[in-house]
């Protein structure tokens, strides 16, 4: 992800148009109660592959839903599975404890499920148990945080972390360049600094800014939580009396970041968010400090369940010529602004 020549790439989620259309339709036409509608808004249907086939059991493991994006991951996965009469969905207790997640996945292996969808707390630490599943003949769909050993998973699906940074860097770089900014103060608030996905986001951001002759002035991580976002932002605001722009990696922690900015009464800056939460999009629509967010959609969980079902049933993807599901699928990172926010708002998750 470190090659600057990749700045212009645009990754493609196969069937993304179908996914988006299905999600929009669900959001606009559902007669379900509000909570149920939110849980099912990011599901999709399409093609003969959706016709009932061999009955399969799909196991699912993810971290605890301690913030909006992870909560949306779990809801989307379960909602997608409910669409299929041939799928039994077995979700284990979500946890942020590595050893507990390993034990939970081992329980699914012991039950001999037909496929596994795993969003690991940390890819390296869960790699061994994923490999155990693969060696037992259970295909693993690795969601988001990647296992380092490709033999540990059949297919990986996730967001374009480098592309997120690139998108944020281009938005900030273009705006500052248009304003003839010289030596601007650009701050970056990461999620968890030790995660490879965070490092890829930072690399993309730095590479994009460099094309405008800019660089990050200060960087600090905020652990993906509202509380840490508020504390980190407050410290950065005190340390920098002049700020031109902030890129915040995560819209969940962005709730705290925005609160700190508003409390400090700072109007000398603009901010770009990350992931595409509904509350961030509402802030963008209202106008103010938050001008944009770059997507990292939890719809990937819906797609992961669909992919696991196809693999377990020995099917390929209907829109592809190839007979089998691809080894990796990367979602495109899209920039949401006031100009296009109404189109993306139905797909936003609640922080």
Q: Which residue stretches match the model-derived regions?
A:
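Extracytoplasmic "Venus flytrap"
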Residues: 43-46, 50-76, 80, 84, ...
């Amino acid at each position: 992800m470190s090659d600057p020549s990749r700045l212009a790439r645009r990754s493609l989620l196969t069937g993304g148009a179908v996914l988006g259309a299905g999600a929009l339709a669900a959001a606009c036409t559902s007669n379900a109660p509000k909570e149920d509608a939110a849980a099912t808004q990011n599901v999709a249907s399409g093609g003969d592959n959706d016709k009932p086939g061999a009955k399969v059991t799909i196991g699912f493991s993810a971290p605890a839903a301690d913030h909006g994006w992870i909560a949306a991951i779990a809801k989307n996965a379960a909602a997608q599975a409910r669409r299929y009469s041939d799928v039994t969905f077995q979700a284990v207790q979500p946890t942020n404890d590595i050893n507990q997640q390993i034990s939970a996945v081992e329980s699914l292996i012991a039950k001999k499920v037909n496929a596994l969808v795993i969003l690991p707390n940390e890819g390296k630490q869960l790699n061994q148990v994923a490999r155990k599943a693969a060696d037992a003949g259970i295909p693993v769909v690795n969601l988001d945080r990647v296992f380092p050993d490709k033999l540990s998973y059949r297919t990986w699906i996730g967001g374009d972390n480098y592309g997120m940074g690139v998108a944020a860097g281009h938005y900030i770089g273009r705006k500052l360049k248009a304003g003839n900014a010289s030596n601007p103060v650009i701050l970056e608030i990461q999620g968890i600094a030790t995660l490879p996905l965070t490092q890829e986001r930072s690399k993309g951001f730095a590479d994009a800014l460099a094309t405008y002759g800019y660089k990050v002035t200060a960087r600090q991580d905020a652990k993906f939580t509202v509380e840490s976002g508020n504390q980190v932002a407050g410290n950065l605001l005190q340390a920098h009396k002049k700020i031109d722009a902030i890129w915040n990696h995560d819209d969940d922690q962005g709730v705290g970041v925005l609160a700190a900015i508003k409390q400090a009464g700072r109007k000398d800056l603009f901010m770009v968010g990350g992931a595409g939460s509904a509350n961030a999009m509402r802030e963008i629509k209202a106008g103010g400090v938050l001008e944009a967010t770059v997507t990292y959609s939890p719809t990937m969980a819906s797609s992961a369940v669909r992919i696991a079902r196809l693999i377990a049933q020995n099917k390929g993807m209907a829109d592809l010529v190839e007979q089998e599901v691809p080894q990796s699928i990367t979602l495109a990172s899209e920039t949401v602004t006031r100009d296009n926010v109404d189109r993306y708002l139905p797909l936003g998750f609640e922080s």
